Amino acid sequence: VSSIIKKCNDFGAGGVSVAIGELADGLVVDLDKVPKKYAGLDGTELAISESQERMAIVVDPKDVDTMLGYAEEENLEAVVVAKVTEEPRLVLNWRGKDIVNISRAFLNTNGAHQETQVKVEVPSKADNYFDSVKEPQDIKKAWLDTLSDLNVCSQKGLVEMFDSSIGAGTVTMPYGGKYQLTPTQTMIAKLPVLKGKTDTITMMSYGFDPYLSSWSPYHGSVYAVVTSAAKIAAAGGDVSKIRLTFQEYFKRLGTDPYRWGQPLAALLGAYDVQIGLGLPSIGGKDSMSGTFNDIDVPPTLVSFAVDVASYMDVVTPELKKAGNVLVEMDIDKDENDIPVYENVLYMYDLLNKKIKEGKIQSAYAVGFGGIIEAVSKMAFGNKLGVELEDTVSRRDLVAKNYGSIILEVKASDLDQLGIPVKKIGKVTKEPVFTYKDVTITMDEALAAWTKTLEKVFPTESNVPQTEIKTGLFDAKTVYTSRNKVAKPKVFIPVFPGTNCEYDSAKAFERAGADVQTIVFRNMTAQGIRDSVDAFAKAISDSQIIMFPGGFSAGDEPDGSGKFIATAFRNAKISEEVMKLLNERDGLALGICNGFQALIKLGLVPYGEIRPQTDDSPTLTMNSIGRHQSKMVYTKVVTNKSPWLKKAELGGVYTIPISHGEGRFVASKEWCEKLFANGQVATQYVDMNGNPTMDEYYNVNGSYYAIEGITSPDGRVLGKMGHSERIGQAVAVN
């Protein structure tokens, strides 16, 4: 498809006039052809209304039908709305009349020349932001106050609402360590490839301190860039490869020269640091409308740093081992508190080399909460302790030393490290933080860190805890297909909202299967009829059906998986499904959204497509009432299913989950029946391998900690955990 696209642009603010208007010098746009979400829009509204999740593409006239055909295959709406013309004019036609007809030369002037007076206020030395950090007197109070600060506190309840493992290429999960409590500063993922493997990764981080920017927009921009670069360096990236993009947001400027001074100072700072570090900003977005009545936003320039590297060079921030040493790597600053850029590049380059040599065990860029924030968050993930040196000053504990990085190194590597550092402490086995005669327990620190946003973005729902004793089911025989196939065919149906088909297909192909994916097209009646026929044919040609995860039809109507189940109840499709299972000894698998479809169809636990009854097992909203995305432990508790043939009975596996409706609910009688029949495939377990109702492990509150179930003979398996999202260098933290 990409080979016939000559140019493309995504829709956003400005709508048609911008997304299409930027594609060529000469254009005639037919606004009547533009798809509308609702009726009643006039020509101006059609031309400038913001629209999302649309793309404008340019193709050769001879390729139009081909492109429209590709779009139809993917169940995408595509229409011809404009033509490129030789005459350099932008023409917008509505209801047979030209409502806009402007020369490109005029548009390229960017409007009339305008000037304004600008006055930049020099930041007050008396109110120097860096000097305003006072030496804490009560260390324990300062420690806990720092961790509970809104700029430092845990955002786990918010982060888990977003799918962090889709694509099976997430190198570092948002929270790392055994307890998944050390926040990752840099988003790292492998490049998505449909075929083959890659060790190439992308890295992305950000930097911004609104309080620093309020004191000095110039310094705010400088340290936004430096902080974003420091986080990349701490993760193992080569800072010299970074490219930047800025997000700017300022108060309404009007004609006040001093108000204009803020964005000018911010941009001057951003320019200075770009020149100093040799790192260009190649994208961004800005807004000058940050005023409501007498309320103004702080001067805002957020720096996003993007880099490329190999996953073999990645370092994660959670502390690794007791006995290791903690050191701080500082950067030089001049008399105006501006980083010495040559030193920044030198230090980060040294760090990159030592990371590649394997000398750095973990690293964390110092942020808003100083050393206290850095060492605490590094310790949380594996619940190791930190003993700080007496030589660390009280002020250093809370100093906002942006650009500095805390490193964990082996004691044996310290003298030969080759980086100018100062020792600040060591990692201890006992989960406590100590500084001189002050001790903060891990529980105290975590309580302070997690409490701030718990009511807004909860991580617990206080579901009653009950003990679960269910044991293992050791089947004497496992169903074996009579039809031997060297390369089984797998059919993966794709519905609107499905997003796991690529991961699922790759997993099956790695295992040696021949995979066919078909998109269910529901935009027209004919599309539905054709899809039904295509699905029926694909099922008849296959030995396995795999229902992938996602959010089919946005989890509507009335619950997830229902759209898929409705489609598969079609007589043609359901007949072929039952033939596959009953006549050809086929298999079926459903993961996440696919499990929801299987259970609504009746394929689990009944083994056949049949209506649900009032007491049928089902999947419902997570007990916490929101989407959950994290890693969980699941235990294989039966060997009855062919799907579990290579799994160890009683074995515990770490897999990602990502769902909002994954809570398995069934009556006591049904649950006892499923366990007795060996139909409970997997259960959520704690770190000791015990099934649990503790929602730290049983994230959705499933009854009896059930994660997956099978049909009576084990050939149909439904489970919530994304077993397909596996791969080399995935979730390394």
Task: Give each language-model segment a name.
Residues V1-G554, A567-M578, N700, Y704, ...:
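Glycine/proline-enriched, intrinsically flexible loops and inter-domain linkers
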Residues I5, K231, I360, L587-A588, ...:
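Residue-level marker of motif borders
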Residues K62-D63, E86, K333, S412, ...:
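Short acidic/polar capping segments at secondary-structure boundaries
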Residues G69, S504-A505, P557-S560, L601-L603, ...:
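Short amphipathic alpha-helical segments
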Residues T255, E335-D337, P557-T566, T682-Q683, ...:
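Short, basic, glycine/proline-bearing loop/turn elements
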Residues I424, R529-D530, F535, M578-K579, ...:
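Amide-donor transfer/coupling interface in amidating biosynthetic enzymes
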Residues P548, G590-I591, K719-G721:
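Active-site neighborhood of phospho(di)ester-bond hydrolases with catalytic His/Asp-centered motifs
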Residues S552-K640:
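Cysteine-nucleophile active-site neighborhood
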